[in-house]
Amino acid sequence: MGIWVTGDTHGDFQRFTTRNYPQLKGMDRNDCMIIAGDFGGVWAGEQTDGRKLDWLEDKPFTTLFVCGNHENFGLLSAYPEREWHGGRVHVVRPHVLHLMRGQIFEIGGLTWFTMGGAASHDIQDGILDPAAPNFERRYWTMRRMNAMFRVLGHSWWPEEMPSEAEYAEAEANLERAGWQVNCILTHCAPSGILPQIELHYRPDPLTDFLETVRQRCRFSSWFLGHYHTNRIIDGRFVIQWGQISKVELM
């Protein structure tokens, strides 16, 4: 069994071709390809997304992902939920699984704590509500201005950030594990790491929660995406984007 981790795909899975990544040859269903958020394959509904998801299902490996901030959370939450390797998942396809927030999985002999989500940083000019009476006028005005905005329920969902119940479940599961896991998988970074990524990133409730995890939890590696860079910070925080990295198993 092997485990590989990559960063944001945003619905583009071409990195998972043997032409782009020859190491895919010889993989099987016991091998796992993990996407560190902004999966983007569940976005416009099965009629639009289905072909790409079926293509991914046909790959020889099992695809696992945590949510990022650019996901259609309404559609994602509608997929069947079940237990898998000790934690809860949404089954997008039999071998395409969403690792839900606050869970601890055992994969490849390693324990993995998962906490997807992030606060969008491309909404400086606001969130438009399609139900507002002046929506269409505001939408086209902002488009002409090249404004940084998104549309509620179409390109932005408040569920990009965890709920209080998800925070509570995460903490309870870490308590049961004695605040010790092998790996942590998130989309965004803990607050204490943000200045080392880029100075303009500001803490928020999720990054603050992850900072608590960083300080309290014993772990070997922390994998994340979100920042569109490939970097390793402090020897343990592996930021992924287009790169695919193999995880060393114990």
Language-model regions: role of each:
Residues 108-200:
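Active-site-proximal loop/helix segment associated with metal-binding centers of metalloenzymes
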Residues 9-10, 39-40, 69-72, 118-119, ...:
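Catalytic metal-binding/acid-base residues of hydrolase active sites
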Residues 13, 43, 192-195, 231:
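Short, solvent-exposed loop/turn segments at secondary-structure junctions
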Residues 6, 11-107, 199, 203-211, ...:
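Core catalytic region of metal-dependent phosphoesterases/phosphodiesterases
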Residues 3-5, 33-36, 183-187, 223:
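Structural motif
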Residues 1-4, 103-114, 183, 234-238:
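Beta-strand-turn-beta hairpins that frame and shape the catalytic cleft
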Residues 202-204, 234-249:
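Short, electropositive alpha-helical surface patch
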